[in-house]
């Protein structure tokens, strides 16, 4: 096996779009990949210093949308362009924007699934950013992405993940097994 120095190569990394409002109520979005489930109804996100972190100082509520093959170009755009430098950033995405149902934050309706969140805790704050733990207050799913059982269907969504090794986006594929079940064959 070839060896490598430590790198941020935990994979897959989700492509998450964090939605916030500024003090004037204008929607903003940023792309984040360093995030994950923290507890049953909580997530953790590593936040760098951005317009989004400034907005979260004003209002601790935000949304998290899951990027897809269809939203990839605009999702990448909001990760490389700051609202500080481009006030028309959100217009350029072409996304439809509505107010979330349970938190004071924008929902980008072009995405199949969105978490409505509220910050519970920030830690390791520094000049460059912080980590946040947020409560999932509500989950919105476009009905065309529901399975026959009424729950979200990950395969229908065409979700993408970030490849931190080659700096690409990869679409998630097909279901290959049943969690907490298939391993029983080895008992």
Which functions belong to the PLM regions below?
Residues 1-187:
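Basic, polyanion-binding surface patches
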């Amino acid at each position: 096996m070839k060896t490598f120095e430590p790198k941020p190569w935990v994979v897959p990394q989700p492509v998450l779009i964090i939605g916030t409002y500024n003090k004037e109520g204008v929607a903003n979005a940023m792309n984040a990949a360093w995030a994950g489930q923290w507890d049953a109804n909580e997530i953790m996100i590593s936040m760098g210093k951005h317009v989004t972190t400034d907005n979260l100082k004003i209002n601790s509520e935000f949304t998290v949308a899951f990027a897809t093959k269809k939203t990839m170009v605009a999702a990448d755009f909001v990760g490389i362009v700051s609202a500080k430098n481009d006030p028309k950033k959100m217009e350029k995405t072409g996304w439809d924007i509505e107010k979330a149902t349970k938190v004071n934050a924008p929902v980008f309706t072009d995405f199949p699934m969105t978490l409505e969140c509220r910050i519970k805790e920030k830690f390791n704050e520094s000049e460059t950013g912080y980590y946040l733990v947020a409560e999932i207050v509500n989950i919105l799913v476009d009905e065309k992405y529901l399975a026959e059982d009424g729950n979200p269907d990950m395969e229908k969504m065409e979700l993408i993940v970030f490849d931190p090794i080659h700096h690409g986006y990869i679409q998630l594929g097909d279901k290959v097994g049943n969690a907490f079940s298939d391993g029983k064959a080895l008992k």
